[in-house]
Amino acid sequence: MISLATARERWTSFLGCFVAVALGVAVVTMSALVLLSDGAKVPERLAGAPVLVQSPAGTQTGGVFTENPPWAPQSAEELRRELARLPGVVDAVPDRSFYAQAADTEQRRGERQGHPWSAAALAEYGLSEGRPPVTADEIVVDRSLGFTPGEPVTVLTARGPQRFSVSGTMNGPGYYVTDRWAAELAGGVRTIGLLLESGTDATRVAAAARRAVGGDGTVLTGASREALAPKQDEMTRWIGGQVLTAIALLSAFVTVFVVSSTFAFAVAGRRREFGLLRTIGATPRQLKRLVYGEALAVGAVGAAAGALLGVVLAPTMTGVLIDAGFQPAGFEVSLRWWVPVAAFATGVVVALVGVGAASRRASRVKPLEAMREAAVDNRPMTRRRRVAGLAATGVGAVCSVGTAFAGADALVLLALGTAMSLTTGLTLLAPGLVGPVIGALTRPLARHPGAPAVLVRENMITAVRRTSATVAPVLATVAFAVLITSTVQTTQNADTARQAAAVRAEAAVVPRGTPGLSDAAVARVEGASLLSTTVYGGDGRAALSAAGVSSAFERVYAVPPPQGDTVVVTAAVAAAHGWRKGQVASLTLEDGRTRRLRVTAVVDDSMPYQVFLPRDVVRDHDPSALADVAYRTTPAPTPLPAGLSADEISVEAYAASDDAEEDRLVWIFTLLLVAVSAGYTAIAVASTVLTATAGRVRDVRVLRLSGATPRQVLLTLAAETCCVVALGAALGLAAAAPALFGTVHGLREELGLPVELSLAWPWLTGVVAGCLLLGTAATVLPARVVLRRLP
């Protein structure tokens, strides 16, 4: 009961803790609801088949999602026939896909929307108008494109633009041609759909299909058919999951920090109160229980508000994630009752964990503290804290030196270790640093005419605990924001420079609104192109990115091109599969056939693909392959007709745009982390300043009695807050600077290229300005209330 009473009485002191717990629980609730939702859906064009058989899964690595290896052509046909003979099965339809795109539309990389007409039977939609295609120049298209039967349509294919006549329209997406024409354009078979007789039990047929398939595939029925959702959507969900997990963990961690700092400052300001309780008989254990009770009360109320807020805002967060590209279109969040309950419990636990140090400090208060009158912090830092701070700073200095000589693998870890160690060290040493540092930096104020300047200086030096409690969160956030944003920008710029320097070409021809360049577009370019495909190494299960190249490949990359039955692989691939120069590598290609190719060269892992094949080999086995880029090696610009959907840009521009989508997602992820940390910092700063200002009624009264006007009082308090925030920002920059300069030096040594440091000034300015704004508001607003109450 005493804990509840003190929590109500000192609500301003615990306001920051309440907000931090509420926001943390809200973020955890929203993140968990999205992560646990079944975002995948059965593709519409396959949803009409109750039973689907998928080819065996390949070897997947974290963050890389590729299609399953296709069956060998003969195996696919034999399996289709066996499945078609099962009781209750009307037909077994192989699904094939190839690149097809109407002119003036857009598709993302990797999409293949063309299919044989027989596969239309697997869709849950059908013809809306017209008839199926009969001849090679007929096609059925999505009616949303606006075409009607009989109209001509230009469709982009891997060969180039082709003219078709629309024979019919569908109620769903896709381009459907005759089976014979599709066989020439498509690769291998990865899915076989089973069409059942009316009234047939799909579960029974699926069981029979599993016996027939054995280990040669996976039988899917019902909700399990969601496994056939596009791999691009699966990758998007995976990226979104990483983002949500990181934000939730960061929120929980920073909530502990805010709760800890809030209660630590509150306990430091209540030493006389605790000393008085000890004087009247309270034991150290009772004081510890009192502080824990206050944390439990504040944490429970904050967690309840946060859980409710998280449930309400989860759909809104889902929409934001979809717009940002962290969840696929059509993703829907589902509510699970136990998620907010678990988040509530987590919030309470986090509050109790955060208050541990403060409760121990309260239990060590002596009864004589009740007699303490002075507000001067005579011993702001313990010996243990000083030793820990010096040790962390020393570790940071060692890591900083190491970044200048580290390789690419250790560079990021050492840079992160430098910043984290220096930030931790300076934060621990803050109570001992702020006095001398502020004394030195504000010495001119001591000679400034007028009392306000002297008061600002002396208040900061005297109230070391209050000053360091405000400096610490600003220091940590500025260091984190500067390190993360600047490191991301610097490494992205360095990677762009590396890619551009590795290519010897005059210009790059890139696709415009299409997944890649067709053969017709590549034929216009005098130079080398990279015909993108996927091959499967070893036992035919390990997916490898591959490119088909021509003889001009050597002029661009200074690597002899593969010819005939040869292949070039990167060092990592060679090591993983035990391939050496001169050995034969067995590769399964896009049509399911296996080729044995002799390794003629092992190249550096910095190459854009893992495997390089002769261009005609890729085209023979992957009729729908598209080139990601074609490099022009001649001085004259390439004439590109509009119908080819291609543009010519500089090599540097292509290097910057090659991973533009990935860089965009990484940058959004980075800014989200910075925003979360900055938000909690603002809470910590505002809470500390609000608590401190509410407890400085005597200071305000003395200033007024000394002749200061209300305006002078407010300006004095605001100036003090601004100086403290500025000091925190300066220390944060000092903590991040060694890591950043070490990273730049390491990148220069690693790449052999000039690398410049890129600072994200807008975000740095925004973080500092936000802390200043909230800190000043938390100082001035309660001070104005106090001034109104004074006579």
Model-derived features: positions:
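Alpha-helical transmembrane segments, especially those used as permease/efflux helices
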Residues: 9-20, 30, 239-242, 255, ...
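Membrane transport/envelope proteins' first extracytoplasmic loop
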Residues: 1-256, 265-268, 290, 501, ...
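Membrane interfacial helix motifs at helix-loop boundaries and amphipathic/re-entrant anchors
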Residues: 34-48, 61-63, 223-253, 308-343, ...
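Short cytosolic juxtamembrane segments of multi-pass membrane proteins
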Residues: 1, 364-379, 785-791
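C-terminal transmembrane helical bundles of large multi-pass transporters
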Residues: 467, 628-631, 645-784, 790-791
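Juxtamembrane segments of multi-pass membrane proteins
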Residues: 420, 425-426, 432-576, 581-594
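Interfacial "coupling" helices/loops that link adjacent transmembrane helices in transporter permeases
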Residues: 6, 10-13, 255-299, 374-377, ...
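Small-residue-rich transmembrane alpha-helices
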Residues: 263, 296-326, 339-364, 399-403, ...
